[in-house]
Amino acid sequence: MGSELKSTSPLAVKYDLSQKIMQHLDRHLIFPLLEFLSLRQTHDPKELLQAKYDLLKDTNMTDYVANLWTNLHGGHTDEDMANAFAEKRRSVLQELSELEEEVQGILGVLENPDLIAALRQDKGQNLQHLQEHYNITPERIAVLYKFAQFQYNCGNYGGASDLLYHFRAFSKDPELNASATWGKFASEILTVDWDGAMEELGKLREMVDSKSFKDSAVQLRNRTWLLHWSLFPLFNHANGCDTLCDLFFYTPYLNTIQTSCPWLLRYLTVAVVTNQNNANQKPRNPRQSYQRRMRDLVRIISQENYEYSDPVTSFISALYTEVDFEKAQHCLRECEEVLKTDFFLVSLCDHFLEGARKLLAEAYCRIHSVISVDVLANKLEMDSAQLIQLVENRNNPSVAAASNVAADQSTEDESIESTSTNVVADDLITEAETATEAEEPEPEVQFGFKAKLDGESIIIEHPTYSAFQQIIDRTKSLSFESQNLEQSLAKSISELKHATV
């Protein structure tokens, strides 16, 4: 996948993270990324076709793999390969028949209303009940896992998810339960059930964080996988960006990012910048405030700049570390090209650009009291008339409210039209590209302070911010941080004791 063919943007190919991310995904999760790259035409189509074949040739999707092989060889068929695919297909169908027969009796019992009413919270009691009344042993329960794995390799992700649900309800095998949780998470992603995927993400995170690993490298690998797999639901669920910030800023996972996958800082940056709507909300946890997240993000990007950087992270560095507005503008233009060819971020491209322009405006206005309309409009890549109207609307609440209502109505109309024209909404690629099919909105920037027009200039009214208030703001989270540190130390001591025993 190294060669380039029809790339409309060499920049997009240079900063493409697909290959880095694929190293930490299950083969079935890799496939949507390959499909996305095929649609974007940023790589050699034949190499992508070969990658799909190599990816799926060991699965049970024999018919699809046979089609890939035929397309890979220019539509020509080979008798030996055709016989090999036919033999594998017969083998798969035979195994399917055997497993269905073996599992049918178990599923009939597990779906029995009388059994469901008799179940308890304790798995041991449930297994004993199954063995005494239905002659279902732990070995027979394990067949559910085997059949789920078979269905998953056939591409029947919904069926695999249901089987894994029943398996986890009765299995006491910790290793198989852990594997089943990973499989359930992947199945929910591939069936585009984002609510279910978020629920499984929580279970998986709890399992990875609470489990005592003898080898710290194994725990690091598990957290690395979790971070990469989580990109699917977190950038598709309604509350995904906020949850992503909580997960990625959590110290163990932040350490994982800095140690093994610094490229994930791109996704953390986009999540923080696009989550500015919650900036004025007061969270129960001070560490979750937008201002705190932005400060932490700037610090982390500065620390990891030697290890990884791209236009997205460079924009934050240029704006807050270097205070170079020209460089920030240049990075912002590059961000658009990079984000529109990123599988996970294509739908957030416009939201990120809008949020980034707001940050650029606020940073520029923070160090000025009087700004030329033309200069600020140039910084934000807006028309002067647009900027003047924006400032006037912000100073007139009634006009602003009417403008917002009209914008909301327009967005709703576009959404309805988009829904009617996109019939297939359950495909990962379709969801990733929904935003790019809609007409790009006009850039909008909301100032975090008062601004008024004075001829061809904008007068910035900076709020008074006393030294006492600064001290209060900087120390009000110390109590929470101390408590969090105490809990972390207690957990570390407990883990050391268990490891010693």
Swiss-Prot record:
The keyword Cytoplasm applies. One of its GO terms (molecular function) is translation initiation factor activity. The modification Phosphoserine is found at residues 477, 479. It comes from the Eukaryota. GO terms for cellular component: cytoplasm; cytosol; eukaryotic 43S preinitiation complex; eukaryotic 48S preinitiation complex; eukaryotic translation initiation factor 3 complex; eukaryotic translation initiation factor 3 complex, eIF3e; nucleus. Belongs to the eIF-3 subunit E family. This is Eukaryotic translation initiation factor 3 subunit E. It comes from Schizosaccharomyces pombe (strain 972 / ATCC 24843). The lineage of its organism: Eukaryota, Fungi, Dikarya, Ascomycota, Taphrinomycotina.
